[in-house]
Swiss-Prot record:
Protein name: DNA ligase
Residues in BRCT domain copies: 599-679
Gene3D superfamilies reported for this sequence: 3.30.1490.70, 5' to 3' exonuclease, C-terminal subdomain, BRCT domain, DNA ligase/mRNA capping enzyme, Nucleic acid-binding proteins
Organism of origin: Desulfotalea psychrophila (strain LSv54 / DSM 12343)
GO biological process: DNA repair; DNA replication
Family: Belongs to the NAD-dependent DNA ligase family. LigA subfamily.
InterPro entries xrefs: BRCT_dom, BRCT_dom_sf, DNA_ligase, DNAligase_adenylation, DNAligase_N, NA-bd_OB-fold, NAD_DNA_ligase_OB, RuvA_2-like
Catalytic activity: NAD(+) + (deoxyribonucleotide)n-3'-hydroxyl + 5'-phospho-(deoxyribonucleotide)m = (deoxyribonucleotide)n+m + AMP + beta-nicotinamide D-nucleotide
Binding site for Zn(2+): C417, C420, C433, C439
Assigned keywords, A-Z: DNA damage, DNA repair, DNA replication, Ligase, Magnesium, Manganese, Metal-binding, NAD, Zinc
Originating gene: ligA
Keyword set includes Manganese: yes
Pfam families (UniProt xref): BRCT, DNA_ligase_aden, DNA_ligase_OB, HHH_5
Length: 679
């Protein structure tokens, strides 16, 4: 948590001196600091800085003081004098208020821009804030709300197109073609049309009247030409808007086209389905983060179906059909208390470092992953080590750096499995427990994995599976043989016991893909994608007859090491597989390439194809299935291995540009259907 001008422990009078020295404040700007403290915080500058610097934890603030601090910090930020980082504001202070009171009015209203000189008018359209997500699970919850709304309106959720854009960190405004307004409180804003009169241009040669957007400045230009005059880009933007007479550096920035108004409708974007969004989430976020040469503080995702937008509507604070993903880059330096081993479902023993309790990203952190025991050994991570850790929406943060390692004698490298006590063996960087048949951790984790991959069962999470194991259950066939009375005997209530039996029956009766069923057994290097590849060459029940040589020679994309791991894993699950297979699971077979010779004869056999955009003749999912049946491999993102990009309606510029750069064939939906003779 840093004050923009430097040391957070500076006395209040020196704080003002530093700011005024940097940008030569006008009288109005000097008054702003005093006005904010009097009107918003109601306490002295020293207290404000103590909170911002971390000398006073938000945990120990009254709700009234916490609210006052948020209001003061927001007002200073909007005026161009940020008191602390975006991450600290969002992940520490705002998160603490949300933890105490999720329905607090401050969280449900638009964060207003400071009142400025100029005509205040009704905005042509409400400018709301954007709801925020800090991890993938929050994005998933947002998606479930959209899916529910789509079902109620009779819309196929899988056909919806989602859009992602960079979230600009500039000065929000609305351009109606005649005037430019600040966002204000979302309903009324200040007329700042003189910014255009001063030469401000719309980005990319765009026209006026494109609605909401932000005034931003090129990052490289700011660093090279403006950093000596302004603490940060917000400060520059505020000066451009509010000053009666512009300073020469501001005029030059406008003339150079470094400062522009960027309408949201002109932002570079990603477009795709919900499944693509989840599968490529990190790639999409990182790609959009690099798309514009301006400061951004997140990525905005939204649906583009206007009818569904209208149905979902908005709160007083944000549109329900839109959400902003924000990454937290806060780092804390902590002391390691101990390193505790944990055994995974595949027998890998992972080190988890327990650290002194530290609040990071608004959460109290006590554990951080150390990845593998080679890292513990080589980097000296043990009791007393000092590490720097970060947390970006993950449950367990990660180690960024070992500041002070400990000696080898202080390291605790386990020799035995923490779950079953068996000897551990090194395999590369990892320690493994080889007792996969009776290790409690491997048994329970494997059960959880089975139901998670099936995806059609509720009620078999970690606590339920652990209770079943403690009640004597050690394998899945025995679980499927249980009746309601058996569940009650191990501690489940009558209603829950009945539900468990119903869920098990449901898992067998609902149709699922055969490759998903095989993937649920958790064979190393045999995830859902590889299972589907295998089953395009051999039927499910015959997969256990494959040799390493066959896999490498006959199936595209498998190397010797992978083939060896797969064959060894299949041998290990063979008996269990056929016990469950005999229970009559309803499985949809994967089309064989050799079946009727269709795949071998098709013009796309052996090709890697990516489908993008909304398809007209069939759903994208159906077209992908059909392509696989014709011998193609379907990808989700453009890579050097992609042979063909098939485009539907409303295609994102990102995939098109990447395909063109890599020289990949681009076909319209109609051209593709003619190629494979679907029309």
């Amino acid at each position: 948590m840093l004050f923009c001008a430097g040391n957070p422990w500076l006395p209040a009078f020196f704080l003002q001196f530093v700011i005024m020295k940097k940008i030569d404040l006008t009288e109005k700007q000097r008054d702003l600091l005093v006005d904010v403290l009097d009107a918003e915080a109601g306490f002295a500058e020293e207290k404000l800085l103590d909170i911002a610097s971390g000398a006073v934890s938000p945990l120990f603030l009254s709700e009234s003081d916490l609210l006052s601090f948020l209001q003061a910090a927001n007002a200073l930020y909007r005026a161009g004098y940020p008191l602390l980082s975006d991450e600290a504001y969002d992940f520490t202070f705002l998160t603490e208020l949300r933890r105490r009171n999720p329905q607090h009015p401050y969280l449900l209203q638009v964060e207003a821009e400071p009142v400025q000189q100029g005509k205040t008018v009704e905005l042509p359209m409400r400018m709301l804030s954007t709801d925020k997500a800090y991890d993938l699970e929050s994005i998933r919850r947002w998606g479930r709300r959209i899916e529910k709304a789509a079902q109620e309106k009779g819309i196929d959720f899988t056909s919806l197109v989602f859009r992602g854009t960079p979230k600009l960190d500039g000065f929000a405004a609305y351009d109606d073609g005649r005037r430019l307004y600040t966002r204000g409180d979302g309903k009324k804003g200040t007329d700042v049309s003189r910014a255009f009169a001063r030469g401000l241009q719309v980005s990319r040669g765009g026209s006026r009247g494109l609605g909401a957007g932000e005034i931003v400045v090129n990052k490289d230009y700011f660093t090279e030409h403006l950093a000596q005059f302004f603490d940060n880009s917000r400060n520059f933007q505020a000066s451009l808007i509010k000053e009666k007479t512009l300073a020469l550096p501001v005029v030059k920035a406008i003339e150079a086209g470094a400062a522009i108004f960027f309408p949201f409708s002109m932002l570079p974007d990603w477009r795709g389905s919900w499944l693509e969004l989840l599968q490529e989430f990190e790639e999409i976020v990182e790609g959009l983060w690099q798309k514009v040469p301006y400061e951004i503080d997140g990525v905005v995702f939204e649906i583009i179906d206007e009818g569904l937008r209208e149905v979902m509507g908005a709160t007083r604070h944000h549109h329900r059909w839109q959400i902003a993903f924000k990454k937290n880059t806060e780092i804390a330096e902590v002391t390691v208390l101990r390193v505790r081993p944990q055994t995974s479902r595949l027998g890998r023993v992972n080190p988890v470092a327990e650290v002194e309790p530290t609040r990071l990203s608004g959460a109290l952190i006590q554990r951080v992953t150390a990845h593998h025991y080679a890292m513990v050994r080589d980097r000296g991570i043990g009791p007393g080590a000092r590490i720097r850790m970060s947390r970006s929406g993950e449950v367990i943060p990660k180690i960024e750096e070992v500041v002070k390692p400990v000696a080898a004698a202080q390291l605790d490298i386990p020799a035995h499995c923490p779950s079953c006590g068996s000897d551990l063996a090194w395999d590369g960087d990892y320690l493994f427990c080889l007792n996969n048949m009776s290790c409690p951790a491997q048994i329970t984790n494997s059960m959880e994995h089975f139901f998670k991959i099936l995806g059609n069962v509720d009620g078999f999470g970690p606590s339920s599976v652990q209770r079943l194991y403690e009640g004597g259950l050690v394998d899945l066939p025995a679980l499927y043989a249980m009746e309601s009375a058996d569940f009650e005997q191990v501690g489940f209530g009558p209603k829950q016991a009945t539900n468990m039996v119903e869920q098990l029956n449901r898992s067998r009766e609902e149709l699922i893909e055969d490759w998903r069923f095989l993937a649920a057994f958790g064979v190393h290097r045999l995830g859902m994608g590889n299972c589907e590849k295998l089953l395009r060459y051999v039927r499910l029940e015959d997969v256990f007859n494959l040799s390493e040589e066959q896999i490498v020679a006959e199936i595209k994309g498998f190397q010797e090491k992978t083939a060896h791991s797969i064959c060894a894993g299949l041998a290990g699950i063979k008996d269990l597989f056929f016990q469950l297979f005999a229970l009559g699971f309803k499985l949809e077979p994967t089309p064989l390439l050799a079946e009727g010779g269709q795949g071998e004869k098709s013009p796309i056999s052996g090709k890697t194809i990516v489908f993008t955009g909304a398809m007209l003749a069939a759903s994208r999912g159906d077209m992908e299935k059909q392509a696989k049946a014709l011998g193609a491999t379907v990808g989700k993102s453009i890579t050097g291995k992609t042979d063909m990009l098939v485009t539907g309606q409303r295609v994102g510029a990102t995939k098109m540009a990447k395909a063109e750069t890599l020289g990949i064939a681009i076909l319209s939906e109609e051209a593709y259907r003619q190629l494979v003779s679907l029309d």
